[in-house]
Swiss-Prot record:
Its cofactor is Mg(2+). It holds the Pfam family dUTPase. The gene is DUT. This is Deoxyuridine 5'-triphosphate nucleotidohydrolase. GO terms for molecular function: dUTP diphosphatase activity; metal ion binding. It catalyses: dUTP + H2O = dUMP + diphosphate + H(+). It comes from Equine herpesvirus 1 (strain Ab4p) (EHV-1).
């Protein structure tokens, strides 16, 4: 069986179960998932009114090239069931009546298990009726090279005067991994409903404008109720992001603990990650439209009923939960 690195670029092998329906939209960049069944978002313990994290099986397995990653996101509002539109240009997206929230998740190219979403809902019994949950898988191209990172003040006129400090702050990754791990620079205790600001004293040289660094959370952190606000690393600014504690009790992180991941992207959509620092939105939603940035290469979501045969083998296989794994 072929390696994942041999999968043709811009082709994603997809297996979708009967409990969800799927279709490609937005010039192929987006695979829309709509529930055919009632999704129960129920807390296992606690009291009504608390904000619970629930791991939701979204009914698909996917395999993409190692040069890509897939971002799982909540679509803004609901999609009409009949008739199916050819695009999103004439579709309105009502407010999310179910009051559930979905954390951004990263599906690595090597993951072969069922994709799962980390979702949050208030109260202990929240049900989402059939056709009322709309999620999306967005294909993102990864940059082939890393960026040149220097300490604050060492970049002048676009030129760097120090050695590259990239791997001093970001752990090396495997070929099948989408992101580079970011470790907490210090111990911290985050109070309920409060944010912790992580600010690494480094900047990157914007020598390659095609590369856009973006910071995402980790599934294990999401499940603990610690949400990294997904954001860009803006050129000329330090590498900074917020971690929000949505629990009703303090949660501690320790120095060296993996708390986030850095993705180096080539064609990130502004509708997915806006070109500014995210200060206040832990659960962004993706709003596709005619202005949605088309991928550099046409994307083919290849549906199959024999995923294990058609998807290339991988070292990770179904290890971890996915989106990113726990």
């Amino acid at each position: 069986m072929a390696s994942v690195t041999n999968l043709v670029d811009s082709i994603v092998v997809v297996e979708c179960g009967e409990r969800w329906r799927a279709r490609a939209e937005a010039a192929g960049r987006l695979l829309v998932l709509i529930n055919n069944h009632t999704v129960e978002l129920s807390g296992e313990h606690g009291s009504a009114g608390e904000f619970y994290s629930v791991l939701t099986d979204v009914g698909v397995r996917v395999a993409c090239s190692s040069g890509y990653a897939i971002v799982l996101t909540q679509i803004s509002g609901l999609l009409p069931v009949e008739p199916e539109p050819g695009n999103f240009s004439n579709v309105t997206f009502p407010e999310n009546s179910a009051k559930y929230y979905t954390a951004y998740g990263i599906v690595d190219s090597g993951y072969r298990g069922v994709v799962k979403a980390v979702q949050f809902a208030p109260g202990i019994n929240t049900s989402v009726p059939p056709g009322q949950m709309s999620l999306g898988l967005v294909l993102v191209k990864l940059a082939r090279k890393s960026i040149h990172v220097t300490s604050i003040g060492s970049t002048r006129d676009g030129r760097t005067s120090e050695a590259n400090l990239f791997y001093d702050y970001f752990a090396p990754k495997r070929v099948e991994d989408a992101g580079y791990d970011i470790s907490a620079p210090e111990d911290a205790t985050i109070d309920p409903d409060e944010s912790h600001f992580v600010d690494l004293p480094i900047v990157f040289a914007n020598s390659n404008p095609a590369v856009t660094p973006c910071i995402f959370g980790r599934s294990s952190m999401n499940r603990r109720g610690l949400i990294v606000l997904p954001t860009r690393w803006v050129a000329g600014r330090t590498c900074c992001f917020f971690i929000l504690n949505v629990n009703k009790y303090p949660v501690s992180i320790t120095k060296g603990q993996r708390v986030a991941q850095l993705l180096l992207t080539e064609d990130i959509d502004d509708a997915l990650i806006p070109p500014t620092v995210n200060y206040d939105n832990p659960f962004p939603t993706y709003s596709p439209s005619e202005s949605t940035k088309a991928p550099q290469s046409p994307v083919l979501w290849k549906f199959t009923t024999d995923f294990d045969r058609e998807a290339p083998s991988s070292l990770r296989a179904d290890g971890g939960f996915g989106s990113t794994g726990l």
